[in-house]
Amino acid sequence: MLGLKGCLTILIGYVIAVCALFSSRGRNPSLTDWEKLKDQKISNIDNFGLTGQHLLEFFQENLPFLSFSEEKYRHKHVSLYYDVFKEYILRRASSKKCLPVDSAIAKLNKDVNPMPVHSHNDYWRKLPLFEGLAYGASSTEADVWNIDEKILAVGHNEAYLDPVELTLDKLYTGPLLEILDEVNCQDSDSDRKNGVFFNSPETSLFFYIDFKSDDNELTYKLLMEQYFKSLIDSGYLTYYDMKKDEIIWRPVTVILTGNYPTSLDILDNGNDNGYFESNQRFAFLDAPLLSLEPKYSKLSVAATVSFSQLMKHCGSDHWKVSLRGRMDSNEISCAKSIIDGAHALKLKTRIWGAPTWPANLVETISRQIIHDLGSDLLNLDNLFMASSLI
């Protein structure tokens, strides 16, 4: 018979084996797993079976092993992470196969519900456009600068622009066209277009274009005639129908913000029937939430205000709110009435510039903005936090 020590040894060995078995389940591939695939290239792998946040984590953890055998990644375009991720996501989009169920959108956000979150400063993310879509953020933004009167570079500061790789077409409009073509391949002539969210193809992505350059008329001309033209021709942009006097929703809704032109003469290219003389206007203005007029129901789909401006308008101060840790009942009542006014004009609302630190204050104010004020888009840099607040 086995002695006490023998029984304990067997028991301990059994426990270790069981723990090892269960620890290997439900996890991302490890270093050991990838060492077995040293001769495998990411370009030979169509689908890892991961979406959303899990896909992002997987790439971050295994990036060296996803790219070490690929000579084309020796010279980066944006970053090694971005280049590898984009190549994986868009691989099938460049093929002639029509299979929306295995599309870039399916890889990015299958089983991820769109959330009313604005991906603030999206171009600063490690994966511009793609990260927001993976989390299900239903709004994004790009700051654009006019370079040499022909290129729209994306960036926050003019001193750090890259007019070769970090451009509006390479980071946003090009990928958007590819992934939308991929999920609309079965009937490209249909008026019904599938959007960028697998679980909700009817949801339109709000795309804020923040004008940074002084010559906003030229920037707008480049947007219409160069950067958005293919999306317009394919029927992917929401537009205002001048004849029917209504907004026709499509997969992407362009909203002009920042130093944008407000003259209808510029917006419609001097025509009474729209920029392309089609009785359609393909860009909407970011309406001022504190000074709304009835005209914005046709010119806009969303209204915006900063948190500090909103609190000042309500006779308070954003510092008071921060020190208190939350908005009080008077501030909530005042702010909610303003947002209700925007909703009466059928406009969505966005409040930017809310406190960003500490985390508990951010969470409290964010919840109040969405649930107490009834604002439509939560404006946050941290998408992981945003996903837990909605």
Swiss-Prot record:
Coiled-coil blocks: none
Keywords: Signal
Signal sequence bounds: 1-26
Entry's Gene Ontology molecular function annotations: phosphoric diester hydrolase activity
InterPro entries, per the entry: AIM6_PI-PLC-like_dom, HAT_RTT109-like, PLC-like_Pdiesterase_TIM-brl
GO BP: any one term: lipid metabolic process
Taxonomic superkingdom: Eukaryota
Disulphide bridges: none
Protein family according to the UniProt entry: Belongs to the AIM6 family.
Protein name as it appears in the record: Altered inheritance of mitochondria protein 6
Organism: Saccharomyces cerevisiae (strain YJM789)
